[in-house]
């Protein structure tokens, strides 16, 4: 059955990775209380009860209603359990076909409803969907355990695993993944331990869902409202218009509403000239979910960390990080810490150097006052203007969203991979802002569908990510249907969407995840697309980021939205020259967050954390990354990646993957850059492979050698 991937990174991104069995299994014991109704009528009206009639089995959003989800979960899980029971009860000896492959075929209805539901709860949630999610989440956990802790089923998987050397390579890989997943899910535990594991998993599913809801609520509630436009001095016209629109959407009587993004440092701070407004925005962002209100998450995260540690101990691991990393490229917490701390010294030194530079500038502007955290990015933007004669306000008019997509991202896809993107306005979407493209290969054949959902709204969680509605699998005969999601401020009606260059690189980043899913050539759902280790999944995304800086790309997509003039060569040169400006700040906030993640998840089951924020401060001090002016990219109470988005003990993965991306991109540049030959090799040896082949073996095949981290240091301006 197809895997349900979830993802987000330093750019708040990424595909969520779950095994296909976990996805399909994750819902079975849901017994919803619904009105008595003729089941035949109910099935005929519920669009999930049959495969979609649309091309590529795309979701029938014009038919889907909130009330369809619970019945579809109920029937989907019942059907799936019956399929699994049939597999476990087969009288004949276990074979790959009657056990592993049969499990991959199972759970079609459950997959359909899960894919749509969990995409909607992140992109356009509402009170009804949140109530369904709260009800479904613990039942999904129980369902997963029902399957993965079944001794008869595991005995058959073990039998296939024992004979795996006789299987073809891809089937052997799949048998190994199933066996590993079941063992890591507790299949070998005794009765009492299994019961405790079930309880932990159910409680964790509830608490992580609660965290997500509290974070969304407090992020919306913490938005900063100002009455006077003078308080927004420095903000461009598009930003002011968006703030006015946000206030209207929130039902406020006039004024301007500055909504918050997911990280600690808000992008808008670099533009706001009024220091008091900067302070309000910064404090609103960094105090989220720790204000002592109903959305305070401190007790919740402490409980989540404790439960994860207990589960790891049950499964034979010292800590949750040991458990997670045993199935990743890094392997161990010590390997992660070694990688992060080996760079920390150079990063801290660069941040100190930047601080000296910014203080000198700031003291000229504010004599007798001290630089504060809310001043950093504003001062950095002013220094960048001075040093490189580069003003973000000068750059933004050249980056209109549609042109960046059509003539930037899609141009790269065409040059590298030979594909073209065709608008499909005939297909329904879940929101008016969503667009659909059919991806056509060089020979005119269809690759799949690509959905885009780029505008922010209160019902969408923060950040940027890729997900899928349908996964590629030759076993089931399905082509990929993927979606890229961001949180770009929507302009006033009739106004163009102008994006920052950071948003441009995020667009390319998420598109890298998109093509990873689109170009998958796997037979089995579990091994396809982005179903790879966390510290590998960010490799294609960060590899594609670098094409945003390619002069040939910028020459096409950086066109002034009013004059139609291409961006001047002199301005392009400034963008390239300033690329690594501020890397001390960016690298330190990231490494601090990654080490904070490791601090929480290397606690053993006996550890007791009292004050959450005191623990955070001590962890950063111990790691020598505590900086008075640079908070971690995410503080503990709003660190969604590790508490609700599948990156627990995994936030390091962005830098681990970045090392692969930097090395691969450098090699591509040495071999001619954005050429069809380079693209064909990357598509064939990386993007199409999923988890069919060990990730590091994929990388070595593409590079022709082992990883060299020199390119990473250069990419971050640390060497």
How should each PLM-predicted stretch be described?
Residues 489-508:
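Short pre-active-site segment immediately N-terminal to the catalytic Zn-binding motif
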Residues 174, 206, 213, 218-259, ...:
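Active-site-proximal, well-structured secondary-structure segments within enzyme catalytic domains
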Residues 38-236, 241, 668:
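N-terminal helix-rich structural modules
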Residues 1-17:
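N-terminal secretory signal peptides that target proteins for export/translocation
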Residues 22-32:
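Bacterial N-terminal signal peptides
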Residues 41-65, 75, 234, 255-257, ...:
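C-terminal, non-catalytic "cap/extension" segments appended to globular domains
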Residues 86-91, 95, 320, 423-426, ...:
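Surface-exposed patches in mature extracellular/periplasmic domains of secreted proteins
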Residues 53-68, 116-136, 157-199, 259-299, ...:
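Short His/Asp/Glu-rich catalytic/ion-coordination signatures at enzyme active sites or charged loops
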């Amino acid at each position: 059955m197809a895997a349900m991937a979830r993802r987000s990174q330093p750019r708040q991104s990424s595909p969520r990775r779950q095994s296909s069995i976990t996805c399909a299994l994750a819902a079975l014991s849901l017994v919803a209380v619904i009105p008595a109704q003729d089941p035949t009528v109910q099935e005929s009206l519920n669009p999930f009860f049959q495969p979609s009639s649309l091309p590529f089995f795309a979701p029938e959003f014009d038919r889907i209603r909130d009330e369809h989800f619970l019945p579809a979960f109920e029937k989907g899980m019942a059907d799936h359990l019956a399929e699994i029971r049939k597999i476990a009860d087969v009288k004949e000896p276990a074979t790959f076909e009657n056990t592993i492959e049969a499990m991959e075929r199972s759970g079609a209805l459950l997959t359909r409803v899960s894919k749509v539901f969990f995409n909607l709860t992140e992109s356009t949630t509402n009170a009804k969907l949140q109530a369904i999610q709260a009800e479904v989440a613990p039942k999904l956990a129980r369902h997963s355990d029902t399957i993965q802790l079944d001794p008869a089923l595991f005995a058959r998987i073990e039998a296939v695993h024992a004979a795996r050397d006789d299987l073809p390579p891809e089937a052997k890989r799949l048998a190994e993944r199933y066996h590993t997943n079941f063992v890591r899910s507790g299949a070998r535990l005794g009765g009492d331990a299994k019961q405790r594991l079930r309880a932990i998993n159910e409680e964790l599913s509830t608490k992580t869902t609660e965290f997500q809801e509290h974070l969304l609520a407090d992020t919306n509630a913490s938005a900063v409202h100002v009455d006077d436009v003078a308080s927004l001095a420095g903000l461009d016209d598009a930003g002011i218009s968006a703030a006015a629109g946000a206030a209207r959407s929130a039902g406020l009587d006039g004024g301007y509403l500055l909504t918050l993004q997911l990280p600690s440092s808000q992008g808008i701070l670099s533009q706001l000239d009024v220091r008091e407004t900067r302070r309000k925005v910064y404090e609103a962002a960094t105090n989220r979910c720790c204000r002592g209100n109903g959305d305070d998450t401190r007790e919740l995260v402490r409980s989540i960390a404790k439960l994860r540690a207990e589960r790891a101990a049950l499964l034979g691991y010292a800590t949750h990080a040991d458990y997670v990393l045993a199935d990743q490229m890094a392997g161990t917490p010590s390997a992660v810490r070694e990688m992060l701390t080996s760079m920390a010294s150079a990063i801290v030194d660069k941040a100190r150097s930047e601080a000296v530079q910014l203080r000198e500038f700031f003291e000229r502007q504010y004599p007798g006052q001290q630089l504060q955290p809310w001043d950093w990015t504003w001062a950095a933007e002013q220094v960048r203007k001075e040093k490189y004669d580069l003003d973000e306000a000068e750059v933004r008019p050249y980056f209109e969203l549609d042109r960046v997509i059509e003539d930037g991202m899609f141009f790269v896809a065409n040059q590298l991979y030979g594909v073209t993107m065709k608008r499909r306005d005939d297909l329904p979407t879940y929101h008016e802002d969503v667009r659909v493209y059919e991806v056509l290969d060089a020979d005119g054949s269809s690759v799949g569908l690509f959905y885009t959902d780029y505008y922010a709204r209160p019902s969408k969680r923060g950040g940027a990510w890729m997900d899928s509605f349908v996964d590629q699998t030759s076993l089931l005969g399905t082509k990929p249907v993927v979606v890229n999601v961001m949180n770009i401020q929507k302009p006033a009606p009739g106004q163009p969407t102008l994006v920052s260059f950071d948003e441009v690189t995020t667009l390319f980043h998420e598109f890298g995840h998109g093509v990873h899913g689109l170009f998958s050539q796997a037979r089995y759902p579990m091994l396809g697309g982005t179903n790879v280790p966390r510290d590998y999944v960010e490799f294609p995304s960060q590899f594609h980021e670098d094409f945003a800086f390619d002069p040939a790309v910028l020459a096409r997509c950086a066109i002034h939205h009013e004059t139609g003039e291409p961006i001047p060569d002199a301005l392009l040169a400034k963008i390239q020259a300033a690329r690594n400006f501020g890397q001390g700040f960016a690298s330190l906030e990231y490494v601090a967050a990654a080490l904070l993640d490791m601090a929480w998840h290397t606690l053993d089951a006996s550890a007791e954390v009292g004050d959450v924020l005191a623990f955070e401060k001590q962890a950063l001090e111990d790691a020598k990354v505590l900086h008075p002016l640079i908070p971690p990219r995410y503080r503990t109470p709003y660190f969604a990646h590790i508490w609700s988005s599948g990156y627990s003990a995994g936030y390091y993965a962005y830098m681990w993957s970045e090392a692969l991306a930097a090395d691969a991109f450098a090699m591509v540049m040495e071999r001619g850059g954005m050429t069809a030959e380079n693209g064909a090799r990357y598509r064939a040896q990386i993007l199409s492979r999923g988890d069919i082949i060990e990730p590091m073996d994929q990388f070595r095949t593409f590079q022709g050698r082992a990883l060299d981290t020199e390119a990473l240091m250069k990419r971050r301006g640390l060497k």
